Amino acid sequence: MTIDRTYPIFTVRWLTVHGLAVPTVSFLGSISAMQFIQR
């Protein structure tokens, strides 16, 4: 029963972390790529 209760919380946390981390990583990567291309 405890597993069923904690599982949704972990999935929500996973989705939020990835939802925030993926865009930031891609944004930083694009910025660094643009800087490298300009130079």
From Swiss-Prot:
It holds the Pfam family Cytochrom_B559. Its main location: plastid. It is a single-pass membrane protein. Belongs to the PsbE/PsbF family. It is found in: Plastid, Chloroplast thylakoid membrane. The gene is psbF. This is Cytochrome b559 subunit beta. It comes from Lactuca sativa (Garden lettuce). Keywords: Chloroplast, Electron transport, Heme, Iron, Membrane, Metal-binding, Photosynthesis, Photosystem II, Plastid, Thylakoid, Transmembrane, Transmembrane helix, Transport.
